[in-house]
Amino acid sequence: MSLLPYALARSFLFGMDAEAAHELTMDMLARGQRTPLQWAWCNETVSDPIELAGLRFPNRVGLAAGLDKNARCIDALAAMGFGFVEVGTVTPRAQPGNPKPRMFRLPEARALINRLGFNNEGLDAFVANVQRSQVRTQGRGQSKLLLGLNIGKNATTPIEDATRDYLTCLEGVYPHADYVTVNISSPNTQNLRALQSDAALDGLLGAIAEHREQLAAAQGRRVPIFVKIAPDLDEAQVAVIATTLQRHGMDGVVATNTTIRRDAVQGLRHAGETGGLSGAPVLEASNAVIRQLRAALGPTFPIIGVGGILSAEDAVSKIRAGADVVQIYTGLIYEGPALVGRAAKAIRDLR
């Protein structure tokens, strides 16, 4: 059980610039993991296993990509009670991301806006960090944490050459991932969301599917591939994406990323900042996409629901909308690690 009341830490962190607070937190987690300091945020892992895409998830609550872009804190995050952790987004080459300031809190709406732009240390450093994780080397028996590795393209790579970056990343992370997520939905890399369009998505997923089969044959292991999509899609676009996912044998979908809409935060400080909005205002838009995906994909296609979970009830709403498992990120910032267990127990109690 966590020894540190998160309200105390949050009061201190919220007095800082949002990105500076994030970096301080990640440094603390990286230094404290695998030491007695880890008890400050340690929580029991709720047992609520589910089989999806050939994987056994220990429970239905995971960490969304974006918090730990460089895979520095896997062991620390595992101690919070997550059933699965997704790290990244990683790109082939290191890149600084967009100019600062680029992360903003909207506390009145329990939300964040970021335009980080896939800032990361690159594929080689990312893989080295994954390999250092003790959770990955030791495992946890039947309750082994699952690890998702989230891949993207470099900002300097022309959109017409994006497939090359995704294939490079897929090959690099493949031996180390329980599943891979293809991120085509961040609003903070120019033209990236164009990859969600019919022809572009068809070409990209076709190439990824082909390369995955080559890697599976060479390594004797078929790693599931998920695709992360945006909430800013109409029903026709969701239907096209669903068809394309199935046509190319993708194993699941992550719904959704951040939104570029600002309807729910108009008039608030920082509401006009460019970037992706996450947190409570995204819940209903994300759930709507999940419902549309479930209707289009049928009852068995795996859906990871993410977007706007700040309470156990929010997590349950994702499951009721059609998600099989859920992920949190902004909720962790506002509510702290205890949210993981509360959400996992509420979902378990649905049974």
Swiss-Prot record:
Q: Which top EC class is named for this enzyme in its record? A: oxidoreductase
Source taxon at top rank: Bacteria
Its UniProt pathway annotation is: Pyrimidine metabolism; UMP biosynthesis via de novo pathway; orotate from (S)-dihydroorotate (quinone route): step 1/1
Q: Which InterPro entries match?
A: Aldolase_TIM, DHO_dehydrogenase, Dihydroorotate_DH_1_2, Dihydroorotate_DH_2, Dihydroorotate_DH_cat, Dihydroorotate_DH_CS
> Could you give a GO molecular-function term held by this entry?
dihydroorotate dehydrogenase (quinone) activity
User: In which residues is substrate bound?
Assistant: K69, N114, R115, L116, G117, F118, N183, N188, N257, T258
User: Where is the protein found, in the record's own terms?
Assistant: Cell membrane
Function, as annotated, reads: Catalyzes the conversion of dihydroorotate to orotate with quinone as electron acceptor.
Q: Self-association or partners: how does it assemble?
A: Monomer.
Question: Could you tell me what this protein is called?
Answer: Dihydroorotate dehydrogenase (quinone)
User: Which species is this record about?
Assistant: Acidovorax sp. (strain JS42)
What gene is this protein translated from? pyrD
